[in-house]
Amino acid sequence: TSSYNPQNQWTNSYGAIQYINLFLEHVGGVKWSDDEELNKLFAQRLTGEAYGLRGMFYFYLLRAHAGFGANGELLGVPIFTEPQTIESDFNQPRASFQACVEQIYNDLSEAEKRLPYEYEDVSGSVPSDFQSLTQDVGKYNTVMGAKARQLYNGIIARAFRTRTAVLAASPFFEDASNAATWADAANAAAAVIDYKGGLSGLASDGVEYYSPTIINTIKDGANPNEILWRGNKGSGDNDQESQNFPPSLYGNGYMNPSQNLVDIFPMANGYPINDAASGYDANNPYAGRDPRLGKYIFYNGSTISEKSITININEGNQDGVNVTENRSTRTGYYMRKRLRMDVNCNPASISKQPHYTPRIRYTEMYLNYAEAANEAWGPKNANGRDYSAYDVIKAIRKRAGIGGTNDAYLEACAASKDKMRELIRNERRLELCFEGFRFWDLRRWKADLNEPVYGISWNGNSYQKITVEERSYEDYMYCCPIPNSEILKYSNLIQNKGWK
């Protein structure tokens, strides 16, 4: 209901925007340093960060609450660019979807022109965009150098421009009032990819960006090659593992991947498992599969060399289906992605390891480009660039170790925009699984929300597909509601169609 929405962004995002608007009102009057050049540099960076963060929070609001109102119009959210006071008129209508997109772009542009792509120390001379503020390399590095790593920067702003453009061009938001195009979305993603170095910038170790080797060698706020923006690297914990390890590893098994997800991982030869050319064996369902399956999901027979253990979902086994309430899998699978196998949750010998949260991966940017470019120009039309949608998907699949020297299934898909769309969406689903994208992707694509959730059971001799949960969604649920408490308070707010 509109009174209970776990995806609600209204309170937190508008609260953040209020603080940002207050900051922007006062930033010019604050003395950040006794040195005039440092003062100007700090003011520019902090102003740029504030604009970028405001654009980010408006993106979260738009993604969560935009939709077709009860009046039939495609609506966004109310826009506030100045701080509200007790004398402000809070009874503001929702701006159009188009106006919200433009506001996000404007904020991101203000960030982009004030911030470097990344915060790194320079030698020699100050970058040309900042020479009007200082010619002193030391002063530039004090404010815009490596000490500011992981703060909001220019490439983060461009990544949110890409996310906004893909959202706005998506099928759910098609409307005469919406000027977004897939070409705009492709160009926005290409700006990030070009900065990364084109196809050659796709991180070779991006499939397991969370591996102990990568995490343990992160230093001083730097990013792994796959990561555009991340959270801090902690000193050590086992929270994710304790929550998601199977019971045999002393975990609580919270996240249970569905059979639906497992089935979309192709065979190592690149063919889907339902293709006659795949070689898939239902009696040995995990043999010869896409290597990402074993890296992202614990399945029956998964081995963990660090712990000398094999996952066994046989009926009655502690890792079996529904053996222990709230701990055992409901689907026959457990999540493995982002978990460290060198963590021990055994109460007798607990060990912890550092982790970090990936806020934005470069692979997402490549997938955004592939989706948008295919829709705008088709699978193989690069529109003047060195890479097409086809080229990006080929590189991602090759990195994963599927398709061999001749990815015949990819080549077949490249002859059709519709087939390539299906393949791109499939690659997006498995590459970004467990990272918070699927919920939003299904809605912006207007995809089927009522597919039953399937799992698998194993009796020691054969596998049996099981129905875990039936889904019941109405069409109006493609968008999330405006909080009912806000609708009751403000007469100018229009609820999204269908929500009560």
Describe the predicted segments one by one.
Residues 34, 168-177, 376-383:
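Inter-helical turn/loop segments and adjacent helix faces that build the functional surface
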Residues 286, 291-396:
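C-terminal substrate/ligand-recognition segments
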Residues 30-43, 116-148, 174-176:
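Short helix/loop segment immediately N-terminal to the Walker
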